[in-house]
Amino acid sequence: MLERKKTLNVFRDARDAYGSYDDFPVGQPGVDPMPHLSRNRMAQPFFQVSEADQVLIQMAGRGEIEFRDARMTLEPGDTIYIPACTPSRLHPHGEVVQLRLKAEPAVREAVAFYCACGAIVASTEVAAGIVQDAYLAAVHAFNASARTCTCGAVHPLVELGDTAWDRVAAALR
């Protein structure tokens, strides 16, 4: 089971990840920025937006990070600065291990679902705190909605894949 500690062995601890996009805080409370560990195997279900800058470190595996108007390839060792309020979405090519450095104390985030035309189909603001509950609620709300863009495109249901946000949130309480 993942836990907060003073030292971190990323590769050993990643084996204990609950599922994709855990964003499990692995540092001691009060560490700023706080490292959040994820082992991802599927495309991120939404674009993630934070009101504070973040840094993403690609520890293992390959993939891409998608911004609104660009994509970048991610290779082991890559470090990506994500400016505040910049929507980004991760697309692993197989299994990846990533550390995301987030502000501590936590700040507001949002999740957004975009259409290929560029319009926002839906978005949800996420209060600071245990964000995994809000991630899960946002996907359920999106799936329960009409999922129709202003351009007329109807978006498919979002698959949760191997995410385990309910278990991560329970572990953080």
What are the language-model segments listed below?
Residues 110-121, 128-131:
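Flexible, surface-exposed loop/linker segments and immediately adjacent secondary-structure boundaries
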Residues 49-78:
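A short beta-strand-loop-beta hairpin characteristic of the jelly-roll/cupin
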Residues 74-94, 103:
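Conserved metal-binding segment of the jelly-roll/cupin
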Residues 56, 110-115, 146-149:
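Cys/His-enriched microdomains
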Residues 120-126, 154-157:
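Short functional micro-motifs and their immediate structural scaffolds
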Residues 1-39, 43-46, 137-173:
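A short, N-terminal "cap"/entry segment at the start of jelly-roll beta-barrel domains
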Residues 19, 41, 48-50, 73, ...:
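Short solvent-exposed loop/turn micro-motifs enriched in small/polar/acidic residues
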Residues 93-112:
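A short hydrophobic beta-strand segment most commonly corresponding to one strand
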